């Protein structure tokens, strides 16, 4: 079976928030396949590269002295952020307040960690701050904002969310897993330099073009990560703050290689190209009579019918739906104008 199998190509993938790794990231991943950053005392080189990855992520997110690590992905990073918030709080009945459009990983985190998840409704695809304010109380341990939502690519009012968290002595966590590598080239207020954010998720293996797995968790204050530490008596290091023990050195090395190659000029060019493609597709769909959610980042959602979407899937296009039923197209780095022209041509055939 393996000898006959071919890896997934990206020629018709329009639904994924992962993409083709940068050539330098691919080469670095292959070189460090057998390394484990979970044992930094033994694998000193990859431990050093992980520190470099965190420094790059801090530069991208406005954090001059970043703490954090390279995680398996956004789900782990979000769970760990909630774990930090729960562990530091003085309450027996912790709750987390998040937008209704927050990633489903927060549902997982609430289940695993035994915290209540309260969701605030959205207004115009961003969290309704008045509704969110009604949900926080003295047992709120974390208030979450999303910087580039999975369904629509919209950015919540992060400074207002951080201010709200401060009123109840809760942490503020921002999920920028997908949007974090696009947002530096926009006018949005979304990062540590814009607001009193405590923790952030940002994934190099999405728009950052690292190889999977390479997520990222950042913290403003290193003492926050102490909430995650457990003793490791049989390793060369004395404690560990990551969720998984063995981790991918390939992911760490590829993240450094990608960011070294692309930050900032390459990512800026990538954003401009992807945003232009999203705007072009939105115009094409709108001209054909579809209601389109105007793209704020390179993601287009439109009201294509389920039969139409099914036909596109039958023709090999990988597309997905929002919770409300719109078709969504994520204009990742591998998505070209030529691809989108072919997509629209198949849409016209229907």
UniProtKB/Swiss-Prot annotation:
A GO BP entry: coenzyme A biosynthetic process
Q: Where is the signal peptide?
A: none
Q: Which InterPro entries does the UniProt entry name for this protein?
A: GrpII_AminoAcid_Decarb, MfnA, PyrdxlP-dep_de-COase, PyrdxlP-dep_Trfase, PyrdxlP-dep_Trfase_major, PyrdxlP-dep_Trfase_small
The GO terms this record gives for MF are: aspartate 1-decarboxylase activity; pyridoxal phosphate binding
Cofactor(s) the record lists = pyridoxal 5'-phosphate
What does the record give as the reaction this protein catalyses?
A: L-aspartate + H(+) = beta-alanine + CO2
Where, per the database record, does this protein carry N6-(pyridoxal phosphate)lysine? 206
Instruction: Please state the pathway this protein functions in, per its UniProt record.
Output: Cofactor biosynthesis; coenzyme A biosynthesis
Keywords for this entry?
Answer: Decarboxylase, Lyase, Pyridoxal phosphate
Q: Which residues form a coiled coil?
A: none
Q: What is its EC number?
A: 4.1.1.11
What's one Pfam family here?
A: Pyridoxal_deC
What is known about what this protein does? Catalyzes the decarboxylation of L-aspartate to produce beta-alanine.
Protein family per UniProt: Belongs to the group II decarboxylase family. MfnA subfamily.
What HAMAP family does UniProt report for this protein, alphabetically? MfnA_decarbox (MF_01610)
For this protein, the record's NCBIfam families field holds:
tyr_de_CO2_Arch (TIGR03812)
Q: What is the name listed in the Swiss-Prot or TrEMBL entry for this protein?
A: Probable L-aspartate decarboxylase
Q: Which organism is it from?
A: Haloarcula marismortui (strain ATCC 43049 / DSM 3752 / JCM 8966 / VKM B-1809) (Halobacterium marismortui)
* Gene name linked to the record: mfnA
């Amino acid at each position: 079976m393996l000898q006959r199998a071919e890896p997934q190509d990206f020629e018709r993938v329009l639904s994924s928030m992962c993409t083709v790794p940068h050539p330098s990231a691919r080469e670095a991943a292959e070189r460090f396949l057998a390394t484990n950053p979970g044992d930094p005392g033994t694998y000193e080189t990859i431990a050093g590269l992980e520190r470099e990855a965190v420094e790059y992520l801090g530069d991208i997110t406005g954090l001059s002295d970043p703490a954090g690590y390279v995680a398996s992905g956004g789900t782990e990073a979000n769970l760990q952020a909630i774990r930090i918030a729960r562990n530091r709080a003085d309450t027996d009945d912790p709750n987390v307040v998040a937008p209704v459009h927050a990633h489903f990983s927060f549902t997982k985190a609430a289940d695993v960690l035994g915290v209540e998840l309260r969701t605030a409704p959205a207004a115009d695809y961003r969290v309704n701050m008045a509704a969110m304010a009604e949900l926080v109380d003295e047992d709120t341990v974390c208030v979450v904002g999303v910087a580039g939502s999975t369904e629509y690519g919209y950015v919540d009012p992060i400074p207002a969310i951080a201010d709200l968290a401060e009123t109840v002595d809760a942490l503020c966590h921002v999920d920028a897993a997908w949007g974090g590598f696009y947002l530096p080239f926009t006018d949005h207020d979304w990062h540590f330099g814009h607001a009193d954010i405590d923790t952030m998720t940002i994934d190099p293996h999405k728009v950052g073009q690292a190889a999977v797995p390479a997520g990222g968790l950042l913290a403003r204050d290193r003492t926050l990560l102490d909430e995650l530490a457990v003793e490791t008596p049989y390793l060369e290091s004395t404690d560990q703050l990551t969720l998984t023990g063995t981790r991918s050195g390939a992911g760490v090395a590829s993240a450094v290689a990608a960011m070294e190659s692309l930050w900032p000029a390459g990512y800026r060019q990538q954003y401009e190209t992807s945003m232009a493609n999203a705007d072009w597709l939105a115009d094409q769909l709108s001209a054909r009579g579809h209601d389109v959610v105007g793209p704020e980042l390179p993601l287009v959602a439109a009201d294509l019918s389920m039969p139409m979407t099914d036909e596109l899937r039958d023709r090999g296009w990988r597309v997905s739906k929002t919770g409300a039923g719109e078709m969504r197209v994520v204009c990742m780095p591998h998505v070209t104008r030529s691809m989108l022209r072919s997509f629209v041509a198949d849409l016209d055939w229907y």
